[in-house]
Amino acid sequence: MAQDVKTQLTALLQQALASVAPAATDTPIHLERPRDPTHGDFATNLAMQLAKALKKNPREIANQLLAELPPSRLVTKAEVAGAGFINFTLDAGFKTDVVKAVLAEGDNFGRSNQGGWQKVQVEFVSANPTGPLHVGHGRGAAYGASLSSLLTFAGWDVTREYYVNDAGRQMDILGLSTWLRYLEQHGVDVPFLPNAYQGDYVRDMAKQMTVAHGDKFVRPAADVLAGTPGLPEAERADDEAKRQRDLHLDALIANAKVLLGPDWTYVHQHALSEQLADGRDDLEEFGVHFDVWFSEQALFDTGLVARCVDLLEKNGHLYVQNGARWFKSTTFGDEKDRVVQRENGLYTYFASDIAYHLNKFERGFDKVINIWGADHHGYIARVNGAITALGLDASKLQVALVQFAVLYRNGQKASMSTRSGEFVTLRELRGEVGNDACRFFYALRKSDQHLDFDLDLAKSQTNENPVYYIQYAHARVCSVINQWGGDLATLADANLALLDNPRELAIASKLAEFRDVIDGAARELAPHLIAFYLKDLAGEFHGWYNAERMLVDDAALRDARVALAAAVRQTIRNGMTILGVSCPDSM
């Protein structure tokens, strides 16, 4: 039981510290596990921390601390190493105590009260509902879901939230794209725009409109194109050509709203609801669930955006220039000031984003975690600035960035897009490699590091595939327990002192690390640390399984080994559950 051992070691060191340096008893004592197991089970740099205050060599202080260390059955060896570290080797009996703790606590092994059940909101994915989720969204979804489960496991009251960007121009473009495909299917000759949404899903939504409403929304091409500025040559890609296409697109949207009248709302909402439902289904199938789906449009409907901008003005953080209202974001470290309300009276996306954060804080969360794509790095300063300008505590907001995942096939970078120029979808990736490989491979790197996703490795059933390797360890334990055929409850009385060979003690030490791994991963918002740990634990188990017989003739030793194996299975299951990966009983 790592926490109890660390508590006991800390108490021993505190007694020694009181004798060696009575004036420095408030010095924090840090205990870490050495990377090299030959250096013992725990190490402390306490002597090096004291060196400046005591004006002594750290090794001299370390030896003095050892001399004053009270005797304890916990420690079989304590020695000075390197520049002044103190390394501790634990008694084997204390190492194997963790096995009983794992079996007794079961699914709760590793849980902590780190968060004190404070309220934390984790907002993630939040992709525009303008098309299918792609592999980039998938990494954010896997990270957010794993982080949410991790924080819950570590004692936080977690709310998982998806911010639905259902207001603004992108939704108008989706509605227009659907209507243009509908007109196309009814023989109306209106050119489809290169800057509209191109995917087959748009055609599918248009067909649904035809099935439900026939030709109700058909309008003459001349009326649809009336007053539009026209399009530049298709091959042009300069800024002016882009501007012309955008003007043409906006003119078509304006015409659609006039020509369809109230029916524009239907077209708009049909496209939104279809894409939102598709994304929700995709995520549910991926094992990613949300407690709240928060509508951006609701911020406008309730007047919160206007109230938020007015509050910024009241606090002296806005100015008017060329008819627009600007937020003084440079005051808070941003590279330039930002428009929150244009000269035509329309609010910017930034304005609604500020209002959304005001809403988060007004809901009383103790911590707010935003999971954003790495391309939003420059957005952090202005959002933090706006929160501060509203008179709120910006330190409650934490932003975790997620880098894009790059797919590899046959050792070569795979195409990330389809023939229509759209990214490979999350659903396609899941269909190829499966949910488990997706969830685990997405968790194999720190979220803000680039991820190379090896499709061939993810599909392989070899020890090189980490998810297979860990699941296989779990399945092997299940096989051992089935062959043993006993009652798991009886393992509480197993004689764990018989687990005395180096491989068994190494596994026990690794099991004892799990609590610390959970604690550190939760503090650092780093579920990848659990993936690393599980790979190591599976490696320790496979090495033991291949070297030793589990079901030996000696009943006492057999039960002890089955107990250790069962503890490995439980710990793997607890870790994989956090990561959203299944643990099959057989493979």
From Swiss-Prot:
| Entry's localization field | Cytoplasm
| Taxonomic source organism | Dechloromonas aromatica (strain RCB)
Q: Which InterPro entries match?
A: aa-tRNA-synth_I_CS, Arg-tRNA-ligase, Arg-tRNA-synth_N, Arg-tRNA-synth_N_sf, ArgRS_core, DALR_anticod-bd, Rossmann-like_a/b/a_fold, tRNAsynth_Ia_anticodon-bd
Q: Which GO terms describe its cellular component?
A: cytoplasm
Assembly notes: Monomer.
Its family?
Belongs to the class-I aminoacyl-tRNA synthetase family.
Q: What is its main location?
A: cytoplasm
MF GO annotations: arginine-tRNA ligase activity; ATP binding
Q: Does the keyword Cytoplasm apply?
A: yes
- Which reactions is this enzyme annotated as catalysing? tRNA(Arg) + L-arginine + ATP = L-arginyl-tRNA(Arg) + AMP + diphosphate
Q: Which Pfam families match?
A: Arg_tRNA_synt_N, DALR_1, tRNA-synt_1d
Known PANTHER family for this protein? ARGININE--TRNA LIGASE, CYTOPLASMIC, ARGINYL-TRNA SYNTHETASE
Q: From the Swiss-Prot or TrEMBL record, give the protein name.
A: Arginine--tRNA ligase
Q: Where is this motif: 'HIGH' region?
A: 127-137
